Structure formats: C-alpha cells, structure tokens
Amino acid sequence: MTKGSQKKDCNSESVIIRYDTKRYDFLSWASHSLGTRELHQLHQQFNYPSLEMVNHLMNLLKNQFEEINGLLYTFINKEIASVLGPIASYQNPPSFRVHFHGTGFTPFHRDRDWHGKIDMNIVRRFRNIWIPLTKVWGNNSLLIE
C-alpha cells in the first residue's frame, strides 16, 4: 500500500493480507508450543482427537502466548493496521483454535448469529482476523461472511 492510499473498508468485504511468514513466524512458535516439528502433521500424533484433547492443545497455545505477545502486537499494528487503519484495541490473548480433519465441535454458523441481543452497531466495528498456521484450501478453510 502506498502513502496516501485509502484504507480498505472491511465492513462489507473480506480482505486477504499477505505478510512475511519468516518475520512473523507464528508457525514455529505454535509447533514448539504443541511439541511437534510439523504442525500440519499434528493429527498423526493422536488416534482420535477428542474435545478434551482439542481444548488441551488450545490451552497449551494460550499458556505460551507471552512468548509471541510482542510479535503479535507488531503484526497487528504494522501489517493489519496498514490495511484496515489504526487498531484501537484487540483481544489479548487471542482465541486459539485447533481443528483436526473430520472433527467439528460446533455447528456451522455465522459469528453475527451468535451475538444475540448485543447491539449490532457495536459488533460491526469488530473484525475477525484469521491467521492460519497450515496451508488452507477448499473445505480446509473458513467460510468468510
């Protein structure tokens, strides 16, 4: 993005932000935190991943978050803000998700449907940022609303 260019209006569109994965090496951090060399092969370490196992893995990431807190701060304030504009606040620590092939622990949904009686004018100001740590394609991804 060049100086003077307009920031993306993400209220009605999805945006893919490309970034330097070597500089922001979230993959190595997650692999180390979960005790695996190849994160995309994590599913091979378990016979059948239960909800308890998935929760355990997400807690491992949350417990190790301080190791990358500064890196995530820089990522948000440089990479994300360069596209969306200044970031007033963000969830810290973020929500970590671990998904295994063939397992789904929540029904198909849209986030906006889960907000119930919350003022939707406030909710619209929030943005979900998804940072996949393994390759994604087709139905190995998220539906972007």
Task: Label the model's feature ranges.
Residues 21-23, 79, 97, 110, ...:
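Functionally constrained cores in energy, signaling, and assembly domains
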Residues 1-85:
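N-terminal auxiliary "cap/dimerization" subdomain that precedes the catalytic jelly-roll/cupin core
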Residues 80-108, 122-123:
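Short N-terminal edge-element motif at the start of the domain
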Residues 106-145:
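Catalytic core of non-heme Fe(II) oxygenases with the double-stranded beta-helix
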Residues 16-19, 88-97, 128-132, 141-144:
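A structural signal for short, well-ordered beta-strand segments and their strand-loop junctions
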Residues 22-24, 101, 134-136:
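Generic structural motif
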Residues 65-70, 94-103, 111-117:
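N-terminal start-of-chain detector that recognizes signal peptides
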